[in-house]
């Protein structure tokens, strides 16, 4: 089976690597071909070398069983439209947003298998939860799901609307809160820290150790940061009574969210 990954960045390599690794562990190893195409040919070659695949031109007229779109969110729809004809059986994206890419894949490849995937982690933290929207299933997308599950990932089926709404809190709001904490923090003498401060500092270090362009795309795509800013302003301006009310609201919200997560994980 032939796979083309359009975009040889972090998530493209993650996807191609999972497909190649699963093929190597099964009888399909000799029959699986993973190719990468990227605007930077050196990046495509490096990704191909890392998984035992090959690099091809973005303008290739070769056909593949499955094409995975792994480009920035802002380029997803145009990439789907351009490369859909290359996919003979299945079209997949790992761009991070779901509503618009799913609609674009449905329009560009109405008679092919279609799945939208969103790994909810950086590739260096894999495996983890992978959000999945199955728009049209079949043997190729089933094999992709098997490969991701075999790599230790937990596949979480969702809908485009549910996913994109959740990302307002999970990504845009969370990143805004962490970056605001980091930006506002001042130097603290050794020994004058608390466990909460140290934990938040560790999270901030993790967030700020990645590509700022990725986080900028998330902020441009999803709402959520504005609600964090509004909540912070309310807390800063609150008197004692109002602060206690806000504190209780926050406590109840976190407790409810934790209970929901625990129930879903059972």
Ranges and model annotations:
Residues 2, 65-66, 90:
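Structural motif
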Residues 54-59, 156-160:
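Short acidic-hydrophobic, aromatic-tinged amphipathic segments that line or gate anion-handling sites
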Residues 58-85:
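Rossmann-like NAD(P)-binding element
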Residues 67-69, 92-93, 132:
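Redox-cofactor binding/interface segments in oxidoreductases and associated redox assembly factors
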Residues 97-154:
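Rossmann-fold dinucleotide-binding core
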Residues 154-266:
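An accessory alpha-helical subdomain
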């Amino acid at each position: 089976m032939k796979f083309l990954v359009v975009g040889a960045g972090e998530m493209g390599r993650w996807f191609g690597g999972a497909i190649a690794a699963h093929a190597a562990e099964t009888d399909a190893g000799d029959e699986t071909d993973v190719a990468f195409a990227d605007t930077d040919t050196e990046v495509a070659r490096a990704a191909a070398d890392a998984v035992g695949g090959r690099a091809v031109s973005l303008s290739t007229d070769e056909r593949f069983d499955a094409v995975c779109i792994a480009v920035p969110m802002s380029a997803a729809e145009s990439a789907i439209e351009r490369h859909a004809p290359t996919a003979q059986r299945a079209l997949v994206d790992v761009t991070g947003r779901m509503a618009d890419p799913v609609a674009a894949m449905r329009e560009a490849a109405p008679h092919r298998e279609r799945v939208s995937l969103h790994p909810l982690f950086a590739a260096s933290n894999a495996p983890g939860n992978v959000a999945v929207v199955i728009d049209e299933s079949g043997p190729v997308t089933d094999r992709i799901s098997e490969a991701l599950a075999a790599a230790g990932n937990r596949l979480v089926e969702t809908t485009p609307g549910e996913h994109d709404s959740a990302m307002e809190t999970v990504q845009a709001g969370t990143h805004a809160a962490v970056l605001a904490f980091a930006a506002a923090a001042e130097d603290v003498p050794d020994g004058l820290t608390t466990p909460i401060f140290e934990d938040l500092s560790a999270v901030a270090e993790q967030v700020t150790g990645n590509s700022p362009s990725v986080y900028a795309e998330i902020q441009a795509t999803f709402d959520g940061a504005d609600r964090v800013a509004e909540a912070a302003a309310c807390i800063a301006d609150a008197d004692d009574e109002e602060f206690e009310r806000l504190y209780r609201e926050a406590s109840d919200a976190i407790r409810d969210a934790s209970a929901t997560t625990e129930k879903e994980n059972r």
